[in-house]
């Protein structure tokens, strides 16, 4: 695919969160970016702006509705002149441990947690990987279509989301095992993961190649688990 015959969707992770108690904040409200987090997302926004100066056409911006992702989208709005559209489909994964300070000692001394740890392949402590991929796939495909409708060939969209949904999306696209070590995720704070699609995917009224690719690769990943 050439640059002009593709639609790109960039998945940007939010910046560092102010969380001195080291709580699993998940979808809890009220968790803002730290000062360092603000600097992180500013640098990411400046990278998008630099690409725009070199000819990239960013025409659509989506963000998770949580405070940290809205704040992360703000400098992108400022530098690219876009308005972020909140989308529940790119929100953080649901997690049983929300609101807790989780460590090995906490898990060992509280048997009530044990039943949530029996199946890391699903995972049993939160939203399933399958559900995450389905909602993210739909959101990414809609963002790509909107970018194409607004900007035609070569247009680009940005989605500001969270580490696990972004990483699971990448694993699904690449057909890799969904069960993984969280320490091995290649999705740092304020990082950018880019997906590219051929514009031929959007020449029909109801393109479904992306969703089909996602679900096919997901099945491969499940079989390999």
Task: Give residue ranges: language-model regions.
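Active-site catalytic microenvironments for nucleophilic, acid-base chemistry
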Residues: 47, 75-79, 142, 146, ...
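Acidic, low-complexity terminal tails and accessory targeting/binding regions
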Residues: 2-8, 82-85, 92-105, 149-155, ...
């Amino acid at each position: 695919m050439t640059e002009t015959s593709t639609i790109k969707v960039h998945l940007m992770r939010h910046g560092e969160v102010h969380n001195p108690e080291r709580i699993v904040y998940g979808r809890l409200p009220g968790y803002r970016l730290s000062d360092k987090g603000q600097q992180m997302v500013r640098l990411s926004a400046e990278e998008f702006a630099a690409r725009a100066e070199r000819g990239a056409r960013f025409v659509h911006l989506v963000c998770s509705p949580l405070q940290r992702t809205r704040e992360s989208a703000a400098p992108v709005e400022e530098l690219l002149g876009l308005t972020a559209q909140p989308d529940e489909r790119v929100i953080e994964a649901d997690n049983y441990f929300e609101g807790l300070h989780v460590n090995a000692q906490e898990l060992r001394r509280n048997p009530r947690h044990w039943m949530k740890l029996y199946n890391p392949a699903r995972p049993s402590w939160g939203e399933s990987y399958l559900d995450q991929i389905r909602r993210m796939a739909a959101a990414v495909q809609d963002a790509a279509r909107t970018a194409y409708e607004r900007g035609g060939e070569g247009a680009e969209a940005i989605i500001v989301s969270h580490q696990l949904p972004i990483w699971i999306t990448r694993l699904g696209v690449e057909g890799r095992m969904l069960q993984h070590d969280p320490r091995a995720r290649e999705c740092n704070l304020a990082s950018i993961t880019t997906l590219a699609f051929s514009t031929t995917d959007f020449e029909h009224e109801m393109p479904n190649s992306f969703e089909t690719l996602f679900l096919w690769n997901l099945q491969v990943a499940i079989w390999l688990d």
